[in-house]
Design a protein with these regions (language model features):
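Amphipathic, Lys/Arg- and hydrophobic-enriched alpha-helical face
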Residues: 58-76, 93, 166, 215-219
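C-terminal edge and immediately downstream basic/flexible tail or linker adjoining helix-turn-helix-like DNA-binding
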Residues: 2-15, 125, 129, 141, ...
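Internal acidic/polar
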Residues: 23-27, 35-39, 125-155, 159
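A short, charge-rich alpha-helical start-of-domain segment used by transcription regulators
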Residues: 33, 43-67
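Arg/Lys-rich amphipathic alpha helix in sigma70-family domain 2
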Residues: 92-99, 109-130, 155, 207, ...
Length: 230
């Protein structure tokens, strides 16, 4: 996320920056305090159902949320419908957010629950049991403000092709990779979103990376002028 943009929307108290300048607390502690203040401001605004705040949150998180839903569903039309429904839930149930956790963790949890609900309504397998993507699942393109660690690692690959490769992974592996490398959540935060034990999250991340490597190698080998690995 663009931290400069966030600072324009949610300003931390002056006392935090003053304390940093005097050196009484570390920069990391100051950043933590700023995030906590931002979360508290969001929680306060959501309890009041502030429409201006919702517009600001959509502007800040729209690309990340839609990308996450695209990876979970593999279908743009479905992802866009769930995108709208997620923000409706945020507005209607905003009082449930207490500001103790990062807002994006709470946001992705809502989105994931909607995907699971839709799967059940359509008599599909649950998210934890879905098989690999079918033939109707297509690669996608979505604008992002800055490259993630995974995108930087794969900077020489076509975005649509990378999306296609990720859609070939088992959904539970794909989800953890997206949350870790695209959304940059910590392993503990991923455990919160997926409601899985931390040990399970670590295992899925390891297995997902192991499964991704040969697929990426096949993608590079299929190119007539494949570049050397980074």
């Amino acid at each position: 996320m663009d931290h400069s943009t966030k600072r324009r929307v949610f300003s931390a108290p002056e006392s935090v920056s003053d304390t940093v300048q005097t050196g009484s607390i570390t920069l990391a502690a100051a950043q933590t305090a700023q995030v906590q203040n931002e979360n508290a401001a969001i929680a306060h605004g959501l309890k009041r159902q502030n429409p201006e705040l919702l517009d600001q949150l959509i502007e800040l998180y729209q690309h990340r949320l839609l990308r996450y839903l695209l990876f979970l569903t593999g279908k743009r039309e479905v992802a866009e419908d769930l995108f709208q429904e997620t923000w409706m839930r945020v507005l209607l149930r905003g009082a449930q957010y207490n500001g103790k956790a990062r807002f994006d963790t709470w946001l992705f949890t809502i989105a994931r629950n909607l995907v699971i609900d839709l799967s059940r309504k359509r008599i599909m397998a649950s998210l934890d049991e879905m098989s690999e993507g079918g033939e109707d699942e297509r690669p996608f393109e979505i604008a992002v403000s800055a490259p993630s660690p995974l995108e930087q690692f794969q900077s020489r690959e076509d975005c649509a092709e990378v999306g296609e490769v990720l859609l070939k992974l088992e959904p539970t592996y794909r989800e953890v990779l997206v949350l870790r490398f695209y959304e940059e959540l910590s392993l503990e935060e991923i455990a919160t979103v997926t409601r899985a034990p931390l040990s399970t999250v670590k295992s899925r991340l390891y297995r997902g990376l192991a499964a991704l490597k040969p697929l990426m190698e096949q993608l590079r080998a299929a190119r007539p002028f494949a570049e050397a690995e980074i």
